[in-house]
């Protein structure tokens, strides 16, 4: 349980993200929001954040994603090799964008930045990567078009040859190469709790949804130089996490396993995946929320990856989407029958299903 941890708040380095400067009361709320699982405040005032936006290409120049990297500045060492890859769900976006949305502001506690902080506490001494969807329909529906064939609202159509594994592998290769070349620190914009709105200017940029958003860029802020060891895939290990809509990426990876293993580099990457977490998976399609095809799961069982599923009544007890709970049970049962190491837990079972508890699964998994 994350709520029982008493970890020192890390000094955070956030890279590959558009500069986000909240002003006035909004900035104050962001600075004082501490990620204290189980309730209370979120965002610790002693945390200093550096935020950058960058687009990292994947398997080809037309397939790229924005990445958010978070690592502890104090206590890091070149020996750290574990990486947590997180795929967000619907409505999750950068904090400033969420606070300005007429509906999504309600869930600003679960912005990409805040989730990265939760994961840093959940997985200490690990690099945390948030992989943003390439398209956000109506600024609400996350669409992982680079990983799986999707409809307008991001519901997937799974195939064995879309290239999700290749895209994910190349995203990491290219991002790691940027750290080796020192590119992540060149011409960086810095978001700092002491940076004032007067030091920033708004520039138009095109959002993933094809609509214009304001990109705020801070002027130079004096910061101590960063000591950041170059990242390497050699000897690295990985944990993959999908939340809600983000689980479609994990599902697509399962469909591609058999073919992906034929590539020696991707096969080596697959062998470096230690654990996969499905957090309350769901999407707007009428089926295939969970993978239930025995032949696909048989291939998955051969990997030896540890599986964790954490669900809430919001998804698995929804009477209007009864297939979700049935598919979840079947997914878990088939994997157990195949001898995989699987844990499955339902949270907030005695509480009324709610979107808030759906998001709170981040605090209790």
Curated annotation (Swiss-Prot):
Subcellular location: Mitochondrion matrix
One Gene Ontology biological process: oxidative phosphorylation
Spans annotated as Disordered: 28-64
Transit peptide, residue positions per record: 1-24
An annotated GO cellular component: mitochondrial matrix
Residue stretches of biased makeup (Polar residues): 53-64
InterPro entries xrefs: C2orf69_mit
Primary residence: mitochondrion
Keywords, alphabetical: Electron transport, Mitochondrion, Respiratory chain, Transit peptide, Transport
Pfam families registered for this protein in UniProt: C2orf69
Keyword Transmembrane: no
This protein's record includes keyword GTP-binding: no
Similarity remark: Belongs to the C2orf69 family.
Purpose of the protein: May play a role in the respiratory chain.
Entry protein name: Mitochondrial protein C2orf69 homolog
Organism placement in taxonomy: Eukaryota, Metazoa, Chordata, Craniata, Vertebrata
